[in-house]
């Protein structure tokens, strides 16, 4: 909407014309003391600019044609002087029962109801409006420059040459702008003002203003409405005020002693009351001075100064809603963020925070958006943590942090230079290992972080080749891992990657490679001579190049893809193991043949369903070479599953390349509906080994995990299943069956129901027999994974719903994360109450769990933000698959 000039202040409007209408009223047929009380005056300018006015009986009908009014009445048409101004009646068509354009859901059309969240009982819907000609008013019709028309059924009286009074209702139209009143209108030419009384209504697209009276001061370009109310349809807000002043030079409402709310009219859950309020509808920003927040008409918060707030999604400087919580670990936790909208492309947030059992903390975040990058800098400082205990600070598992002063620094950067260059930086540092567990998220989300990523990347990608470089350091912040632990990962200082692809007819050529410098700083004091002799301190460079050629042949009935490749690796080592080479290298050939067929059949009673049968064979041969004396910088055993049947290596990284002479047998069947949707899938497969596997990792435990199946001639039987029971129900499952031991090695199952965003039910179970542990298993602790996870959201009605999660470790009889809560929500506010029990350190080798409990409350006022406990939303979205805020229509 464009309020370049108010209707009431426009120089071409009837009321504010520079004397033209007043002169015509004084010198034409209207000079008689009053017009007939039984008629209706309707005027419109003709092609020459003269006004054609007629007195119409109220029972008569009139038609507008080509700039003149044709009256089906017995009276003559009087002509006003050229240059005078007039208006026509603007008919309004709205929904039955609508009050100030608020339409209850029951009275909406199906199309309107589809755009309203389920928890809302109605919405502000702007009615369609028609002019005198019966045509719907064009919302884009600019009032400035549009002809001004008016109509009145009342009497027009002239007191003096400068003053005119109109008794009765007056309706004015100028473009898409209309104004009406019911009682009387006084025009003062000398003062250039107009006074209207009796049910004044002012409309433009997206704006409705009503009041008991209005005063227009053209000299100051202001329109004043008394005892007023307003509706801004675009933002879904409304309110009332003793006075509203509309400034014609901009889309601004100045409100005195007014209210602001997004709730249902007459049933406001919350309102903002203010001495003075300014709503800039063009910018989407409001400001209020002397603000009182009222909940159900009870004042709960007062701010005596000026506070900005958004009308929509705009960013505005000012205090954000506070966050309030309480946990057994930190006590009462209160944070009050202050947002600084410094410029359109950068901003900052400063958050003072008080933790009852720890002390005062301050955090800051600065965000900068450049033409080619997004950048964020975050910092936090808690000086003098009151839970610090010097006597126990160095004891693993102690409640005391390792340091008295706690801090955090983080930098994130993501850039895109043109279409081919990209950059990324991620840097984090903390004062101690328990920082995130104690302070990371106010107790509302699990923060058991054990690693900090520090990396920077620069990449270039062309259509047929790529190159990149990165540096990476992973810091361990696990209090149970020492600085001499051999499982501390290596740093990449730096790493270069490259690759290219090319097509020659049907042949596909590809090469990938990398060069990495691996470095690691271990505490020598914690290492034994045997460990150092075995290469615990080894570091160095590694070059890996992998050319490959393939000839894919694909068709509707199947495919066959033969591939041949060579993998060459060279190391340059320092402090390598005793008796090993300083510059070893390795070159291994590879051949694979991947093939599959697709059979289809129509199901006799399948209502258009098609069933497929898809056998697949994957043969892999990889040369064997003794690699036991090579370092393991980044290699690890990949967990075996159905997808692993078709991989060319059972290890990740390039320090180990698995030897193989094997054939993978797989069979899948799919059920596809007539619309092409996959409704079910079942796959099963196994690897047949023609030779024993020799290559293993160095870790004794990982060697045991690897060697366990290496002498068998068959792998475990693996399968996966998917079944779409209906549009709402979905079942997924996978299984790994050990034929030799006749037991399940690993399995998982999940069943999910989602009718919509407000009807969610998830249940899952995960089992794994062998877990990779880097230390002895304590007596009485079951290292197997046996976990169930149940979560859901279920509404009791359109406003109330239950939500919760139960994540349980059956191996050791403990809750990993359990919460239950209730929520009330409408289109005005959301209230949540959640009780939670969780553990931060859920590593399986811990004898004692660090259990936390808490009760959290959240009140969200739509349009104002979270009044308390804002982190609950993240906790729910992390814990309940598919969770969304109540009422979202996405």
Q: Can you say where each PLM-predicted feature lies in the sequence?
A:
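Gram-negative bacterial Sec-dependent N-terminal signal peptides
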Residues: 2-30
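Short, intrinsically disordered low-complexity segments
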Residues: 3, 10, 60, 71-74, ...
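General helical structural elements
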Residues: 8, 15, 65, 76-79, ...
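Residues at the start of alpha-helices and the adjacent loop-to-helix junctions
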Residues: 9-10, 23, 177, 554, ...
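Short helix-loop boundary/capping segments at the starts of domains
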Residues: 21, 172-175, 516, 520
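Post-signal-peptide, soluble extracytosolic/periplasmic N-terminal scaffold domains
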Residues: 33-248, 336, 340, 379, ...
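Outer-membrane beta-barrel proteins and related beta-barrel translocases across Gram-negative bacteria
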Residues: 97-101, 105-111, 116-130, 155, ...
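Conserved beta-strand and immediately adjacent loop positions that scaffold enzyme active sites
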Residues: 169, 275-276
């Amino acid at each position: 909407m464009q309020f370049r000039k108010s209707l009431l202040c426009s120089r071409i409007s009837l009321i504010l014309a520079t004397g033209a209408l007043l002169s015509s009223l004084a010198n034409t047929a209207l000079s008689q003391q009053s017009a007939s009380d039984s008629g209706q005056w309707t005027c419109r300018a003709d092609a020459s600019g003269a006004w054609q006015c007629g007195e119409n009986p109220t029972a008569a009908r009139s038609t507008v044609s080509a700039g003149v009014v044709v009256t089906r009445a017995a009276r003559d048409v009087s002509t006003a002087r050229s240059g005078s101004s007039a208006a026509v009646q603007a008919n309004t068509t709205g929904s039955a029962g609508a009050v100030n354009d608020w339409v209850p859901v029951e009275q909406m059309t199906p199309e309107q109801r589809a755009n309203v969240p389920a928890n809302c009982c109605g919405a502000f819907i702007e009615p369609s409006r028609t002019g005198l000609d019966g045509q719907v008013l064009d919302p884009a019709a600019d009032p400035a420059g549009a002809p001004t028309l008016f109509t009145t059924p009342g009497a027009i009286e002239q007191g003096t040459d400068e003053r005119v009074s109109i008794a009765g209702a007056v309706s004015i139209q100028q473009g898409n702008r209309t104004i009406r009143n019911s009682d009387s209108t006084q025009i003062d030419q000398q003062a250039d003002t107009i006074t209207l009384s009796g049910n004044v209504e002012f409309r433009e697209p997206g704006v409705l203003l009503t009041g008991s009276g209005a005063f227009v001061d053209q000299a100051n370009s202001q329109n004043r409405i008394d005892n007023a109310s307003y509706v801004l349809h675009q933002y879904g807000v409304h309110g009332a005020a003793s006075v509203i002043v509309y400034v014609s030079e901009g889309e601004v409402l100045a409100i005195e002693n007014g209210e602001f709310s997004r709730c249902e009219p007459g049933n406001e859950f919350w309102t903002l009351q203010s001495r003075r309020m300014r709503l800039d509808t063009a910018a989407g920003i409001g400001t209020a001075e002397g603000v009182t927040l009222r909940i159900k008409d009870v004042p709960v918060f007062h701010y005596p100064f000026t506070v900005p707030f958004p009308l929509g999604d705009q960013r505005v400087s000012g205090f954000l809603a506070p966050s309030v919580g309480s946990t057994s670990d930190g006590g009462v936790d209160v944070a009050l963020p202050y947002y600084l909208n410094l410029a359109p492309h950068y901003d900052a947030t400063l958050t003072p925070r008080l933790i009852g059992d720890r002390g005062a903390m301050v955090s800051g975040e600065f965000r900068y958006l450049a033409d080619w990058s997004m950048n964020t800098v975050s910092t936090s400082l808690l000086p003098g943590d009151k839970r610090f205990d010097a006597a126990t600070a160095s004891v693993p598992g102690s409640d005391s942090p390792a340091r008295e002063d706690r801090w955090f620094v983080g930098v994130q950067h993501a850039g895109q230079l043109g279409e081919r260059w990209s950059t990324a930086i991620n840097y984090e540092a903390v004062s101690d290992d328990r920082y995130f567990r104690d302070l990371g998220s106010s107790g509302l989300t699990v923060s058991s972080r054990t690693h900090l990523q520090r990396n920077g990347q620069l990449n270039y990608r062309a259509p047929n080749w790529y190159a990149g470089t990165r540096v990476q350091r992973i810091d361990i912040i696990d209090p149970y891992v020492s600085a001499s632990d051999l499982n501390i990962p290596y740093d990449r200082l730096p790493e270069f990657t490259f690759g290219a692809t090319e097509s020659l007819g049907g042949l596909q050529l590809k090469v990938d490679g990398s060069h990495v410098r691996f470095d690691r700083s271990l505490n020598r004091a914690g290492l034994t001579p045997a460990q150092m002799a075995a290469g615990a301190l080894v570091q160095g460079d590694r070059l890996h190049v992998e050319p490959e050629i393939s000839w894919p042949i694909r068709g509707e009935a199947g495919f066959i893809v033969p591939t041949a490749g060579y993998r060459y690796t060279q190391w340059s080592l320092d402090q390598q193991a005793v008796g090993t080479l300083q510059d070893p290298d390795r070159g291994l050939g590879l051949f694979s043949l991947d093939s599959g067929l697709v059979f289809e059949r129509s199901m006799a009673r399948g209502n258009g369903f098609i069933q497929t049968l898809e056998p697949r064979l994957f043969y892999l041969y990889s040369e064997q070479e003794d690699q036991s004396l090579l370092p393991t910088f980044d290699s690890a055993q990949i967990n075996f599953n159905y997808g692993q049947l078709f991989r060319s290596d059972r290890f990740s990284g390039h320090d180990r390349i698995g030897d193989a002479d094997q054939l993978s047998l797989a069979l899948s069947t799919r059920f596809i509906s007539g619309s092409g949707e996959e409704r079910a899938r079942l796959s099963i497969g196994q690897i047949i080994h023609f030779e024993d596997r020799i290559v293993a990792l160095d870790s004794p435990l990982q060697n045991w995990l690897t060697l366990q199946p290496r002498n068998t001639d068959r792998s475990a039987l693996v399968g996966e299943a998917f079944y779409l029971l209906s549009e709402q129900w979905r079942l997924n499952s996978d299984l790994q069956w050990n034929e030799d031991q006749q037991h399940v090695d690993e399995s998982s199952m999940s069943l999910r129901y989602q009718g919509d965003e407000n009807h969610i039910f998830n249940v899952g179970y995960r089992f794994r027999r062998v877990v990779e542990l880097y230390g002895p298993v304590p007596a009485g602790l079951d290292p197997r994974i046996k976990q169930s996870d149940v979560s859901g959201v279920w509404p009791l009605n359109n406003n109330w719903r239950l939500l919760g999660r139960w994540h349980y470790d059956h191996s050791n009889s403990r809750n990993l994360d359990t919460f239950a809560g209730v929520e009330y929500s409408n289109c005005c506010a959301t209230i949540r109450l959640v009780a939670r029990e969780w553990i931060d350190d859920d590593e399986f080798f811990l004898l004692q769990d660090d259990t936390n409990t808490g009760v959290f409350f959240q009140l969200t006022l739509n349009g104002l933000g979270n009044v308390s406990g804002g982190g609950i939303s993240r906790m729910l979205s992390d814990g309940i698959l598919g969770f969304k805020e109540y009422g979202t229509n996405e």
